[in-house]
Curated annotation (Swiss-Prot):
The keyword Metal-binding applies. GO terms for cellular component: chloroplast stroma. PROSITE patterns: HESB. InterPro entries: FeS_biogenesis (IPR000361), FeS_cluster_insertion (IPR016092), FeS_cluster_insertion_CS (IPR017870), HesB-like_dom_sf (IPR035903), ISCA_plant_cyanobact (IPR031108). This is Uncharacterized protein ycf83. Fe cation binds at residues 40, 106, 108. It is found in: Plastid, Chloroplast. One of its GO terms (molecular function) is protein-macromolecule adaptor activity. Keywords: Chloroplast, Iron, Metal-binding, Plastid. Belongs to the HesB/IscA family. Ycf83 subfamily. SUPFAM superfamilies: HesB-like domain. GO terms for biological process: iron-sulfur cluster assembly. It comes from Pyropia yezoensis (Susabi-nori). The lineage of its organism: Eukaryota, Rhodophyta, Bangiophyceae, Bangiales, Bangiaceae.
Length: 114
């Protein structure tokens, strides 16, 4: 089953990889997806596990079977419509971000401008 937050879609392969990575963390964590300044195109994607105590009232949240994905409102402006996928290919593998709001992306796909 894909995860759809209404603003971010997470594919089955991405959900599977997130679940694998989550196993390396304690149980009381969620995955935070966001953007930050930096990267070759001006902004870069961020994904990290953080303790659920850090959840803010303004965060958007998607509850899945064994974890939650959250996003802050400022990042949401840049991520609306984002599709998060995962590829296990040797070249070009890893998490892949497809962002309809990005006017320009860098070659690695991890940085964009909006």
């Amino acid at each position: 089953m894909e995860g759809n937050m209404g603003f971010i879609t997470i594919t089955k392969p991405a959900l599977k990889q997130i679940a694998i990575l989550k196993n390396d963390h304690e149980n009381d964590v969620h995955l935070r997806i966001g953007v930050r300044q930096g990267g070759c195109s001006g902004m870069s994607y961020s994904m990290n596990f953080e303790h659920v105590d850090k959840l803010k009232d303004t965060d958007e949240r998607l509850r899945l079977d064994n974890f939650s994905v959250v996003c802050d409102p400022k990042s949401l402006l840049y991520l609306y419509g984002l599709s998060l996928d995962f590829s296990s290919e040797l070249i070009g593998g890893g998490f892949q971000f497809s962002n309809p709001n990005a006017s320009q992306t860098c070659g690695c796909g991890k940085s964009f401008s909006g």
